[in-house]
């Protein structure tokens, strides 16, 4: 299963890592590595994440960090539609593309 980012998700990831890098370069590296681990797990087990009210969208936590990855699972492809800090207003979470 391949993983593809929407343009919005790419911007969100760059924003998260850019913010972290400005305040803690080591923290940015750790969060980036953990996001990659979570995405690797999703490529093997695409239904791992929790269902959302916007089915078929799912979300998975980037533990121990406070980030959520929102994605659409598919047979051959996972589409990442958003990466958000868990404390953000729920109404700002992504819709389906």
List each language-model region with its residue ranges.
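Basic, Lys/Arg-enriched alpha-helical interface segments
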Residues: 2-57, 74-77, 93-96
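Conserved strand-loop elements at the edges of beta-sheets that form or border functional pockets
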Residues: 7, 62-64
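Short, conserved catalytic or interaction motifs in soluble domains
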Residues: 47, 62, 85
């Amino acid at each position: 299963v391949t993983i593809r980012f929407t343009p919005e998700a790419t911007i969100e990831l760059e924003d998260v890592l850019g913010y972290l890098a400005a305040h803690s370069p080591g923290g940015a590296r750790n969060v980036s590595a953990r996001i990659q681990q979570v995405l690797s797990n999703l490529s093997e087990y695409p239904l791992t994440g929790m269902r959302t009210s916007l089915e078929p969208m799912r979300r998975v936590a980037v533990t121990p960090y406070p980030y959520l990855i929102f994605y659409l699972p598919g047979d051959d492809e996972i589409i990442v539609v958003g990466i958000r800090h868990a404390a953000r207003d729920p109404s700002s979470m992504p819709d389906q593309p």
